[in-house]
Amino acid sequence: MRLISISTTIAFGFAFQAQAATELQWWHAMTGANNEMIEELTKEFNESQSTYKVVPVFKGTYPETLNAGIAAFRSKQPPAIIQVFDAGSGTMMAAEGAIVPAAEILQKGGFTFDKSQYLPGIVAYYSKPDGTMLSFPYNSSSPILYYNKDAFQKAGLNVDNPPKTWPEVFEAAKKIKTSGAAPCGMTSTWLTWIQTENFAAWNNVPYGTNENGLGGTDVKLQINAPLYVEHFQAIADLAKDGAFRYGGRTSEAKQLFTSGECAILTESSGGLGDIAKSGVNYGIGQLPYYEGHGPQNTIPGGASLWVFAGKSDEEYKGVAEFFNFLSQTEIQAKLHQVSGYMPVTMAAYEETKKSGFYEKNPGRETPLLQMMGKAPTENSKGVRLVNLPQVRDILNEEFEAMLSGQQDAKTALDKAVERGNAAIAAAISN
């Protein structure tokens, strides 16, 4: 009887432990070094307590993850947390009843939410007009310029002074190509996010009407204005000569840089982890601009964490605990310093500065200085469309036709505006 009693007690003990750990699925789109960071952070959180277990689940690219989340919600089987890229923010904000604001989640969990503790530009981007933070900004980034120092030296370019304006970048790309310093002068990830949305903000020109969508959903695109045409025609001309090489619609072009094929890359600061691991002798510069227009301020990219409605109070408490964990200064500082993403709290930023990290790692403060250097204007607060992922797809189709020589920049941008405006109008009416 005693043996039965002991075994029964053990069995009940294990059952209790299994029930006590409330599982919280976190769907995400991170790969490479950034996926390693997610695994490390969730392991650290899970080991810090025994009540909740966060389970990270990779769901593909940013658009694929968003689509998977939408489908899961419709089938009433959503995860507790989903990582949604910046372009999907408008879609999530418009889905009333499908999400619970992050600020509300933190308050439900017994935590005091003080938005003054967070970087203002990041919090504002993921908040309602009344200031309510809707999602937790996990991996916010800013586009910057990376350059291959060895290729610059071979081409006779200044290794310690990367080009600052777009005309200077284009000239450097030509010189790199013609000198044979690298097979390709330059490339860029995310032509939509970097070369249109951030291009607008950084050069203080409108992307669309109605404050780029922040003032209302009825938006008319303005990305066929003369400065855009000049910029994209210059890129198209470089592509004809092979000085610019197209890598793909999202972050694929990063491989062209890490392989040594292209010597200049405009990419998210969040791409730093993979670039650092590649062994390329790289330098960092600010995002290029046009004289007389920029630099103004960049807008956040990357992604934030959204919480689906329909979960239990216990699950929401667990999510609040996890968000609070991610907000800790040491966690934010580590995420920033290892990945290149920006810290979301002022305390983590100040801690990183005090540690001397930026002095030891030149260029690493650049994303933050770009975003916070100037107060935003109507052109540089951000872009918020109810169907921004769809509009990006339209732009990418026209850019790809341009880069393959099927049309010039003006035709590509005119068609993108016409098609994009029609898609926005249809999305609003639906």
Curated annotation (Swiss-Prot):
GO terms for cellular component: periplasmic space. Keywords: Periplasm, Plasmid, Signal, Transport. Residues 1-20 form the signal peptide. It is found in: Periplasm. Sn-glycerol 3-phosphate binds at residues 62, 86, 141, 268, 302, 341, 392. Its main location: periplasm. Part of the ABC transporter complex UgpBAEC involved in sn-glycerol-3-phosphate (G3P) import. Binds G3P. The complex is composed of two ATP-binding proteins (UgpC), two transmembrane proteins (UgpA and UgpE) and a solute-binding protein (UgpB). Belongs to the bacterial solute-binding protein 1 family. This is sn-glycerol-3-phosphate-binding periplasmic protein UgpB. The gene is ugpB.
